[in-house]
Amino acid sequence: MAAAAMAGAADPPHLTEAKKLEYFSSINSMARKIMQEREKIKETYGSAWSQMSPVEQDTAIDNGMMDPRIRARYAMHRVDRDEVICYPKLLIQTGQKIVHFGEEDLTWQDEHSAPFSWETKSQMDFSISNMTELFVPPSVNEPKPKTSQTTKPPSNDESSFWKISAERSRLDNEKAEFPSLTPSQIKSLEKGEKPLPSYLRLESGSRDMEEVPVSRPAKQRAPKPPAPPPPPPVPISMTPAAISVTPTPPAPVPSLEEGWERAQSTLPSVSSTTDEVFSPGLVTRSSSQSNSTVKDVEKAEASPASSPTFSQFNTSSSILKTGFDFLDNW
């Protein structure tokens, strides 16, 4: 830029004026007209223009662009005015129209009536200087109002909350005995009880954890008694519809499920009822044969029922599911 400035200073004056004319004329049409008027004024002064000072050149341009009669008219109406500190405000009285509504005696004043204004009367009368008068700061000598009359006494919940917060902050400073409060601890603090230290709470928690596994075996399900050995096989002679029941000998180590299946296999009433339902020979059977069959079945049932250990099994067709047997056979 320094080189360009030096090159511009080295150019002759007529080249500099030509560049100025070209630049300002290329801005817009108004600038081009102004530059043309300026060139006409320069031509009227001729060679004396280059000898004039910049102030004299500006005065000559102003006098050439504005008619002297117009300048004299403005000079006649020139009045010395006081300087206005703030922006001048148009003092008009708007909203002077009174509106009457129909036949009823309803009247109101139209705030936006003639003379019209976008602002209402209250908006036009508003001033910031009035606000400073309204908000006068109180003097230092004035006594302060009593806070006891204006302040509301804190409720019990708020007071307890602040007590708990103060207690917690104090304990946090003292190595933070409890990092977090549970609802039960908050209730105990509200009642005035002191919470247990952290090491005591840890021990009590560990004791509870130790007590839980000890008490669990007592709650476990009682083991089912082993299945009793089946009675010796008793041959039963029945009609073709009846079937002789011969229970299988027990295994060396009988399990609970095998004992239950074995006990059900020794129930002759179930097998007899099944045959009675599905055998076609029962349709022509006489009542005497049925009575003798029932007596034989009752004798067979009486022999296993005599043992005390076998009495826990139900020999009826509807097996009662009680206790843990219900869970095993669900």
Swiss-Prot record:
Record's compositionally biased regions (Pro residues): 223-235
Residue ranges of the region described as Disordered: 136-160, 172-314
Ranges of Polar residues composition bias in the record: 263-276, 284-294, 304-314
Low complexity bias (residue ranges): 236-246
PANTHER family, alphabetized: SIMILAR TO RIKEN CDNA 2310022B05
Protein name (record): Uncharacterized protein C1orf198 homolog
Organism: Danio rerio (Zebrafish)
Biological classification of the source: Eukaryota, Metazoa, Chordata, Craniata, Vertebrata
